[in-house]
């Protein structure tokens, strides 16, 4: 890390919150491929926007077309993938937006790093930013049966290496803020669980 740089602080987060009439936070969806993360994230974004809240969704596949197109799927690259996304999500949250991330993020340590990053106050602010971990939980058998992209089949055939749940581990969250058991659960109910939690913590209040 460079040592000859300084952080240029401008307006405070509280000033931004007042201007946008909302607080910023990050909602971090994690789970196996085909668990339903992206589908839930899309509907969650829509519902937040309908409530007049500024939200932005960061999706695992989409980000790899741009910001993270130089990364593969080794453990080191997965770590860097999540580190970058955590930094970007924090920027959105610090701007008084609601960042919704939808990434497998298989390693517990990486998710903990993302959380701790949000807990560190930015210059000019005395507190960190809310970080809400949402575990979209389905058994591997269910995810593999869904397999909309045919990725599990390719992983079983050895075409895709280091595939989470097959040849690379997924470390389930131990204490997520929201635990969505997404087997035969209507999308509206899955999103309701998340919004109910946010409302209970007054995270969507101005």
Curated annotation (Swiss-Prot):
Pfam families: APS_kinase (PF01583). It catalyses: adenosine 5'-phosphosulfate + ATP = 3'-phosphoadenylyl sulfate + ADP + H(+). One of its GO terms (molecular function) is adenylylsulfate kinase activity. Keywords: Amino-acid biosynthesis, ATP-binding, Cysteine biosynthesis, Kinase, Methionine biosynthesis, Nucleotide-binding, Phosphoprotein, Transferase. Gene3D superfamilies: P-loop containing nucleotide triphosphate hydrolases. One of its GO terms (biological process) is sulfate assimilation, phosphoadenylyl sulfate reduction by phosphoadenylyl-sulfate reductase (thioredoxin). Belongs to the APS kinase family. It is an enzyme of class 2 (transferase). Its EC number is 2.7.1.25. SUPFAM superfamilies: P-loop containing nucleoside triphosphate hydrolases. This is Adenylyl-sulfate kinase. ATP binds at residues 31-38. Pathway: Sulfur metabolism; hydrogen sulfide biosynthesis; sulfite from sulfate: step 2/3. The active site is at residue 105. Catalyzes the synthesis of activated sulfate.
């Amino acid at each position: 890390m460079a040592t000859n740089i300084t952080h240029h602080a401008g307006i405070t987060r509280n000033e931004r919150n007042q201007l946008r009439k909302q607080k910023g936070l990050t909602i971090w969806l994690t789970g196996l491929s085909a668990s339903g993360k992206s589908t839930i994230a899309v509907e969650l974004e829509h519902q937040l926007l309908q409530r007049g809240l500024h939200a932005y969704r960061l999706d695992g596949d989409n980000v790899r077309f741009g910001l993270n197109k130089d990364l593969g799927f080794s453990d080191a690259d997965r770590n860097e993938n999540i580190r970058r996304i955590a930094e970007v999500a924090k920027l959105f949250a610090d701007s008084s937006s609601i960042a919704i991330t939808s990434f497998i993020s298989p390693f517990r340590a990486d998710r903990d790093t993302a959380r701790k990053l949000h807990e560190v106050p930015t210059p000019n602010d005395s507190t960190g930013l809310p970080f809400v971990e949402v575990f979209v939980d389905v058994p591997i058998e269910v995810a593999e049966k869904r397999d909309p992209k045919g990725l599990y089949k390719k992983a079983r055939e050895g075409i895709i290496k280091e595939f989470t749940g097959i040849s690379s581990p997924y470390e389930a969250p131990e204490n997520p803020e929201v635990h969505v058991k997404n087997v035969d659960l209507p999308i509206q109910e899955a999103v309701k669980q998340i919004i109910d939690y946010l409302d209970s913590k007054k995270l969507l209040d101005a």
